[in-house]
Amino acid sequence: LMDGGLQRVAQAKGAMQHGNVALKGEQIGKAIAIIGGLRESLNHKQGGEVAGNLDSLYAFMQQRLSQANLRNEVALLDEVTELLREVKSGWDGIRQS
């Protein structure tokens, strides 16, 4: 899911830079849905505080994507990309342990 989210944000950024409003909105919508899937997969009973923190972070990312869509701001897409990369790096590190 993380890779899919990163791809959708990158595609939205390209669409934004080329003035393709329809594609931008479509890709941002898909990225928001992917992050929603990540939120839904959180197990708050087992994950405790970590799951709660991730839920808040994912909600923040969804909000920033919506703002990027409304404001046409590439910087907000870049912000979400960095956050997704950091979370992905953390999960990848756990898997390698």
Where are the model-predicted features located?
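N-terminal intrinsically disordered, cationic/polar leader segments
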Residues: 1-10, 17-18, 22-29, 36, ...
